[in-house]
Each structure stands twice: as C-alpha cells, then as structure tokens.
Curated annotation (Swiss-Prot):
Family as reported in the entry's similarity comment: Belongs to the ETF alpha-subunit/FixB family.
Protein name (Swiss-Prot/TrEMBL): Electron transfer flavoprotein subunit alpha
Gene: etfA
Note describing how the cofactor binds: Binds 1 FAD per dimer.
Species name: Bacillus subtilis (strain 168)
GO annotation, biological process: fatty acid beta-oxidation using acyl-CoA dehydrogenase
Pfam families: ETF, ETF_alpha
C-alpha cells in the first residue's frame, strides 16, 4: 500500500531550489505507489507549480499571500499545519536548510511527532522507511526508523539524486485559502549582506580559504578560480574570525554543512570543526604549504605548495580548458 508524502518546496528569487527536487525524489522513494504532494508558499508561486510535477510530484498545493513573500515561522507554520491536518500524510519532508531547520521542529512539536534531521539517504526496508544520517561530525552514520504514525524529516542538500525532469508528467495544481492570524513577525525589508553568487549550501563546486589566505585580499585568487569554475566561495572559521571574510561563508560545525561534488581547500589546516562541515564532499582537493596538515588525511588529492602560486596556475589551466571546450 502506497503512502502519502508532503514535500515543502523552497523558492529563492522566484525559482525553486535544487533541494526541493531532491526532497521530491526522497518523497517518491517513501511513497512507493502512493501520492507525493508538493506545497509552495509565497507570493505568485502558481507559475512555478508545474515544475514540481515535472520532477515527481503528483499534486501541488499553492498558498499565496503578500505576507508570505518572505519566510516567517508564524506564517509558514500556519499554512503547513492546515495542509497537514487536511491531507493527513504519512511523512512530511523538508530541505535541511535554514528554513527547513527552523520550521520543521516547530511543526513537529506542535503536532506531537518526532523529527529525523539531516538525512543523506532514504530507503524502504521491510515496509519501514529508513533514514541514514551522519553522526559524530560525520565519522559514523546511523540508520533511523521512526515509530511515529507521521514522519517528519529534513534532507541534506546535494545527497539524494533528484529525478530527471519529465515534462510529460501531469498532475493537479490547487490553491489553498490563506487566512493568517496573529502574525508576530512581519518582514519589512530584506538586506543582503553578501554579493549575489552561487548558493553555498547547494553548490556543486566550492573553493574555500582558511587562515592561509592571510588577508581579505588573499581571497581574490580564490574568487577568480571560483568564477572560472562556476563555484561558490567558502571559508573556515579561522578565516572568518580573522576578519578575512564574512561569517556567511563559514563552513564547519558552527557554520554551513556542505556536500559538493568538488571541494578545493586552500590554506585550510583541517581542524575537526571544519571537517565536520565538508568531509562528505565527493572529491576533496587540499592545497597547503604544511605537508603534515590534517586536511591531507581526508583529501582525495593533495598539493603541497603556496596557494598564491598554485591557485593562479589552476585558474589559468581551467581557463584554457574552457576555451578549448
């Protein structure tokens, strides 16, 4: 017997984030031959609802209101609670993002159910939904089965393969009547602190710098390499603490957890707190002058050398590859 799964979509700058498609794929695994329902909340979201169906949703529910244009826990939780009570799903899936990490525990607590967070894989064994999640800073993995009648879970970006887009798929798109009451938070303005670029949490390639960059200006070669690769720029806490870059770029135990296809660590020693945020990257390249640096212990490829010499060489080489391709 199939299961009913609700997936909350995430929208940024009018477009669906990749983690939404990955969450839909997880929902399809859980549902079997059941129903996957996508939920889109915001302003003018009807226009992108069909894309969820193309990636595997059977039905999409849209909630539109000017007050929902920017995420607030009050507004989104009211909408989601109404949807959950109406649909009575077996599972509710979120991305393990800033929004998902804020909203999912609030809803789970209000609905008196458990939450499985930061899952990197979903499977079904013997009729049970099994979530795999990292523990001990990624040194081990646990497989979790929930005994609650309704499962809440968050999915780490870049770990579950999204389904191929199928424009031949069809499904229903329905609007939800929105009646927001007692909103304690109203967003008046959003000021972006960092420049527009590739989103760090969903980036396929990341170029990260540590204390070895030595200054704010030291990040310039990394930014040039990132631009050539179409990558995001990240940093260790040491670089952030030294005021070489903004804390929005921090990767690690107290920063963002990332799992890109390629992670290039430049001048990063490899403190355990940093490794906790990037050790599950598919391919790790380390550049460091110290041959004994801990980062080399987990690197797939290591370059012992001065990053200010190595990184420009890599940048030039990739430029040539781009030209010839």
């Amino acid at each position: 017997m199939g299961k009913k799964v609700i997936v909350l979509g995430e929208i940024r700058d009018g477009e669906l984030r990749n983690v939404t498609f990955e969450a839909i794929a997880a929902g399809r695994t859980i549902s079997g031959d059941g129903e996957v329902i996508g939920v889109l909340i915001g302003e003018n979201v009807q226009s992108i609802a069909q894309e969820l169906i193309h990636y595997g949703a059977d039905k999409v529910l849209t909630a539109e209101d000017p007050k929902l244009k920017t995420y607030t826990a009050d507004g989104y939780s009211q909408v989601m609670r109404g949807v959950i009570e109406q649909e009575n799903p077996d599972s509710v899936i979120f991305g393990h993002t800033a929004m998902g990490k804020d909203l999912s525990p609030k809803l789970a607590a209000r609905l008196q159910t458990g939450l499985i967070s930061d899952a990197i894989d979903v499977s079904v064994t013997g009729g049970n939904v099994v979530f795999t999640r990292p523990i001990y800073s990624g040194k081990a993995f646990e497989r979790v089965i929930s005994t609650d009648p309704m499962i809440f879970a968050t999915i780490r970006p870049n770990n579950i393969q999204a389904s191929e887009k199928d424009t031949s798929r069809s499904g229903s798109i329905e609007s939800i009547d929105v009646s927001l009451t007692d909103l304690r938070t109203v967003i008046q303005e959003v000021v972006k602190k960092t420049a527009d670029g590739v989103d760090l949490s969903e980036a396929k390639i990341i170029v990260a710098g540590g204390r070895g960059v030595k200054s704010k200006e030291g990040f310039q070669p990394l930014q040039e390499l990132a631009e050539v690769l179409g990558a995001a720029v990240g940093a260790s806490r040491g670089a952030c603490d030294a005021d070489y870059c903004d804390y929005a770029l921090q990767i690690g135990q107290t920063g963002k957890v990332v799992t890109p296809d390629l992670y290039i660590a430049c001048g990063i020693s490899g403190a355990i707190q940093h490794l906790a945020g990037m050790s599950n990257s598919k391919v790790i390249v380390a550049i460091n002058k110290d041959p004994e640096a801990d980062i080399f212990k987990i690197a797939d490829y290591g370059i012992v050398g001065d990053l200010f010499e190595v990184v420009p060489l890599l940048t030039e080489e990739f430029k040539q590859l781009n030209i010839h391709s």
